[in-house]
Amino acid sequence: MNILANDGIHPAGQKALEAAGHNLWTEFIEPQSLAAFINDNAIDGLLVRSATKVREPLIDACPNLGFIIRGGVGMDNIDVAYARDHGKEVRNTPAASSQSVAELVMGHLFALSRSLHDSNRRMPVEGVEQFKALKKSYGKGRELRGMTLAIVGFGRIGQSLAQYALGCGMNVIGVDQQSGVKRIDLAIGNQSVSVEVPVMTLHEALPLADAISLHIPAQADGKAVIGSMEMGKMKKGVILLNAARGGVVDEDALLEALDSGQVSGAGVDVFVGEPKPRLDLMRHAGISLSPHIGAATGEAQERIGLEIASIVAEIGSK
């Protein structure tokens, strides 16, 4: 088959696809030229990550395109229902990046609990002259052990995050549409431990959590899941983490909550208006920042590439 990896693919995935006899293009084609490239080269499958948008006009313009695979989890850059209605198979790689995203969230959580995000900004500028003052300023850290983490969206990424948090001695609450109990397995050395985690609704969990992490897709109506009302129900001084999608958290409400102290700190990996996030978010001292890199590890990208190759093989066998 002829396959275009428009946002690139890990060498392991490229090797697997080419070894299976597929013709693979890996250059990035600009949006205005993408339909023509697909049609001129008889492309059967389009591989994308988050950069390439697959909207209705592109789908209409490429009637012979057979499948679209999103390397990653969220598919809000693809008009999935429309593509499927027009006979195109649409898949993603939901399991491949879970651990990498969870580790990034834990990195933000550690940074915020000890003000590392801000001290790393100020030490190069003020560290020599104001060392004692900075030491005093950042001397009110918190241990994660004993804190309660609510994980909103308790799928693969949420459960992977739960494993890390439980390993740090945190109490974990899962947030999903159906309440109940979920068993989380922890591998410690050669032993396995199973821990029961309560699962409840968002509004039940909000007042209980010391930290809240979001792992849900962008909403179909474009509205934020966490706005000023939800933040008002949280514990004062809560830590809020978003490595899901920009817009899931109302950015105006977040800034207000940070300024008032309702939210003590926020770890933000995703933004409205990417790749040009708003400047006041970038400069806020209460925010630990990263540029949408949840799945950006070599290990995750290798797994994504190999999972894509496996999906292509499955599609080709039908």
Model regions and ranges:
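An N-terminal-biased, well-structured beta-alpha scaffold segment characteristic
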Residues: 1-90, 207, 227
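Conserved N-terminal Rossmann-fold NAD(P)-binding element of oxidoreductases
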Residues: 6, 150-153
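Short, Asp-centered acidic motifs that coordinate Mg2+ and/or phosphate
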Residues: 44-45, 67, 211, 239, ...
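Rossmann-like adenosine-cofactor binding region
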Residues: 54-59, 177-280
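Phosphate-coordination loops involved in phosphoryl transfer and adenosine-cofactor binding
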Residues: 65, 145-148, 228, 237
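Phosphate-binding beta-alpha-beta segment of Rossmann-like dinucleotide-binding domains, i.e.
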Residues: 86, 94-148
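Hydrophobic/small residue at the entry helix of a nucleotide-binding pocket
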Residues: 157
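Adenosine-phosphate binding glycine-rich loop
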Residues: 270, 275-278, 282-316
